[in-house]
Design a protein with these regions (language model features):
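Membrane-proximal interfacial segments on either side of biological membranes
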Residues: 1-365
Length: 365
């Protein structure tokens, strides 16, 4: 015989002992310290039980009114992006619906979140399907600044921004972002199908759209699209100042990629090399081999019709050979205080780098 049992449980507001959830949350609590959690809830449940008292077909639905939830320590370091962020994060007045059926845990909710001392809005949907976690979150940021240094992007504190994150956390600890979107006034940053390894290295990427003004008030408007195993980068304008600065501090032992071997074809109408100087019709290609830049060829023209060419190639001896020539050196060398009086003429740079050691020759004539 099988008996069907159902019921309802009502919990008044209480300060809950989070340690009681350790069997459910497994090792998630090892890196998180929760100070308190206050809530009230209404839960409906049902299950079948046989004559041997074995339970099956368990179903649980809970409407949770989360009044206060304070984390005083957590492993996420979001301070590079949110300067006011601390380990202490406070959630208030969240309405949460929880459904549990067999191997599927479904959580949906929304409410207030404090980043530092500033109040923001958060909504989320999290589905744990037998260890595979599907998430869809939206964070509205109005009272905090938002910074993305490698894109030279900064949202002013008084402006509103919407961040959407949608993806899957797989059992093998790989993370797939199906959609990352940041929207603020006329600015938009969009990333689709970004695959990260368990070490948070980029394994694959399908699409990137940049359409925003950066800290220099320069327009970045480009698109990256995947075609089979290769990529194209096309656009109206791009500020490469930050990219140039970062390349000067490059650490060849580090990489943001994993198992990455692809070719990029590039064509950009206007490319800024600093706030005031730019080139027209940048085109060429570059190739990554075993996660590192293996070959690059780029050509472009300054506004006065002077040319520049850059090539990088790694030979069979693992030497990286860089060649750069231009008949308009002024915008390229004026950033260096030790080079004065050579702003006209011809620039020829040649470098060989191996095992972190470079031998370079610079001619300005």
């Amino acid at each position: 015989n099988i008996f069907f049992i159902n019921g309802k449980v009502i919990n008044d507001q209480q300060n809950f002992d989070i340690s009681k959830l350790e069997p459910i949350l497994d090792d998630w609590l090892n890196n998180i310290e929760i100070e308190k959690i206050d809530f009230n809830s209404i839960s409906s449940f049902s299950f079948n039980v046989n004559k041997k008292l074995k339970l099956n077909d368990l179903k649980l639905e809970t409407n949770l009114n989360l009044k206060n939830f304070e984390i005083v320590k957590n492993p996420l370091n979001l301070k590079p992006f949110l300067p006011n962020y601390t380990e202490q994060v406070k959630f208030e007045d969240h309405k949460i619906k929880i459904k549990l059926t067999k191997d599927i845990l479904d959580i949906k909710g929304d409410g207030d979140i404090y980043i530092g001392d500033e109040l923001e809005q958060l909504s989320y949907s999290i589905i744990n399907n037998d260890g595979k976690i599907i998430f869809d979150t939206k964070l509205n940021i109005k009272n905090n600044p938002l910074i993305i240094n490698f894109l030279d992007y900064k949202k002013k504190k008084e402006d509103s921004s919407e961040i959407l994150l949608k993806g899957i956390y797989k059992k093998n600890k790989e993370l797939i972002f199906k959609n990352i979107s940041i929207t603020e006034k006329n600015n938009q940053i969009l990333i689709k199908d970004l695959l990260l390894s368990k070490n948070f290295k980029i394994k694959d990427l399908d699409y990137v759209k940049l359409d925003y003004r950066n800290k220099n008030d320069l327009l970045n408007k480009i698109e990256l699209k995947k075609n089979k195993s290769n990529f194209s980068i096309k656009g109206k304008s791009f500020d490469a100042t930050q990219l140039i600065n970062n390349s000067m501090d490059d650490d060849e032992s580090s990489t943001i990629f994993e198992n990455f071997n692809s070719r990029f074809d590039i064509k950009i109408d206007t490319t800024y090399i600093n706030k005031n100087d730019y080139t027209k019709n940048l085109f060429g290609n570059f190739t990554f081999k075993e996660n590192k830049l293996d070959k690059l060829n780029l050509e472009s023209t300054f506004s006065n019709n002077k040319k520049m060419n850059l090539s990088i190639e790694t030979n069979n001896q693992k030497e990286t050979i860089t060649k750069f020539v231009s008949n308009y050196p002024k915008p390229l060398i004026k950033r260096y205080d030790f080079i004065k009086g050579f702003e006209e003429g011809y620039l020829d740079f040649y470098s060989i780098k191996k095992d972190g050691v470079s031998n370079s020759v610079l001619i300005i004539d």
